[in-house]
Swiss-Prot record:
Keywords assigned by UniProt, alphabetized: Cytoplasm, GTP-binding, Hydrolase, Magnesium, Metal-binding, Nucleotide-binding
Subunit relationships: Monomer.
Record flagged with keyword Transcription regulation: no
Organism: Pectobacterium atrosepticum (strain SCRI 1043 / ATCC BAA-672)
Domain Obg: 1-159
Stated name of the protein: GTPase Obg
Magnesium in keyword set: yes
Similarity comment text for this entry: Belongs to the TRAFAC class OBG-HflX-like GTPase superfamily. OBG GTPase family.
Example GO molecular function: GTP binding
Binding-site residues, GTP: 166-173, 191-195, 213-216, 283-286, 314-316
């Protein structure tokens, strides 16, 4: 299946149903009073994280999603039916942004996590709500409000523990093939890897971690050159980055400059990638003499100002790979993933008499009071029967 990690969709929540103007009319009850019911609330739009999905390709073809409108109120104080909600399934790891404002609405990082992205409109009030001592036969109602409408940008970020960095042909895909069951394409030309891939590294029956391989970076990637800039976002959730440096580049380029290119692109990209733990791994030591490999690695580390430990490996024949993987496993155990628990603020409980409806009723009552003028003289009141007078 084609890997698609970005999509734009339009979501429209349902409008609220309108209130009804109606009066009770039955045999022997000619003036039964108002009985218009309220409308129904509009349906909401939700996103649901599903671990069985791994691409956003479905939303390249289906781009519009609309929740159901609330039904209008009816006579006999019948309330309209609430509109049905709509649920859109997305892969775990999807980031949701409002395209208009750029606001991050949420990160779908857990299976079955739900996120409301569109609130349905409020129902309108029927004329029975406006009955009062001064307005026995109200002919007012309110219409339902519009549901939320917005364009969303969905970005799929792979959930991996370890991310691979390096120029094209640094040996990233070969490494992930050597340590996991993943089989990304491997060849002797640049940009063999066109899309990210994940591999599970199993150290024993109880310990494992996930490694992500992304297309190689080139100079100017942070400005849009090459393929890597599109996929650097997949490294944002990694706990450690493995920076692979080719000790014997096929194009005879300078490994020191190659390593500096990657470091510079991380700093230019931002999003905290440059501050993440990064390990220096020298690959393809099997292509040169062992002493020469150690000499080159030492020179590169000194030129980069690298004081931490570095590794010499050959991903092709798995030389030095197992100790590296165990060190990664121990690092991950010592630095467990911090699951961000969003402390959701207590939501305002919205009943039928919410602020919107209170304002509507207050306006109508104010108008009715202004129209009602009583001079306390019963003689000029039309339609008033004097029952008793002293």
């Amino acid at each position: 299946m084609k890997f698609v990690d970005e999509a734009t969709i339009l979501i429209v929540a349902g409008d609220g149903g309108n209130g009804c103007i109606s009066f009770r009319r039955e045999k022997y009850i000619p003036n039964g009073g108002p009985d218009g019911g309220d409308g129904g609330d509009g349906g909401d739009v939700y996103l649901l994280a599903d671990e069985n999905l791994n691409t956003l390709i479905d939303y390249r073809f289906e781009k519009s999603f609309r929740a159901e409108r609330g039904q209008n109120g009816q006579s006999r104080d019948c309330t309209g039916k609430r509109g049905k909600d709509i649920t859109i399934k997305v892969p775990v790891g999807t980031r949701v942004l409002d395209q208009g404002t750029g606001e991050v609405l949420g990160d779908m990082t857990r299976h079955q996590q739900s996120l409301m992205v569109g609130k349905g409109g409020w129902h309108g009030l029927g004329n029975s709500r406006f009955k009062s001592s001064v307005n026995r036969a109200p002919r007012q109602k309110t219409n339902g409000t519009k549901g939320e409408e917005r364009e969303l940008t969905l970005e799929l970020l792979l959930l991996a523990d370890v991310g691979m960095l390096g120029l094209p042909n640094a040996g990233k895909s070969t490494f992930i093939r050597a340590v996991s069951a993943a089989k990304p394409k491997v060849a002797d030309y640049p940009f063999t890897t066109l899309v990210p891939s994940l591999g599970v590294v199993r150290m024993d029956s109880e310990q494992s971690f996930v490694v992500a391989d992304i297309p190689g970076l080139i100079e100017g990637a942070s400005d849009g050159a090459g393929l890597g800039i599109r996929f650097l976002k997949h490294l944002e959730r990694c706990r450690v980055l493995l920076h692979l440096v080719d000790l014997a580049p096929i194009d005879e380029s300078n490994p020191i400059e190659n390593a500096k290119v990657i470091i510079n692109e991380l700093e230019q990209y931002g999003a905290g990638l440059a501050e993440k733990p990064r390990w220096l791994v020298f690959n393809k030591v099997d292509l040169i003499d062992k002493a020469e490999a150690e000499k080159r690695a030492k020179e590169i580390a000194a030129a980069l100002g690298w004081d931490d430990k570095y590794y010499l490996i050959s991903a092709a024949n798995r030389e030095g790979v197992n100790p590296l993987c165990w060190d990664v496993m121990n690092f991950l155990k010592a630095n467990p993933k911090m699951m961000a628990i969003a402390e959701s603020a207590p939501e305002k409980v919205e009943f039928m008499w919410d602020d919107y409806h209170r304002e509507q009723l207050a306006e109508v009552e104010k108008e009715a009071e202004e129209e009602w003028d009583d001079d306390w003289d019963d003689e000029d009141d039309e339609g008033v029967e004097i029952i008793y007078q002293k």
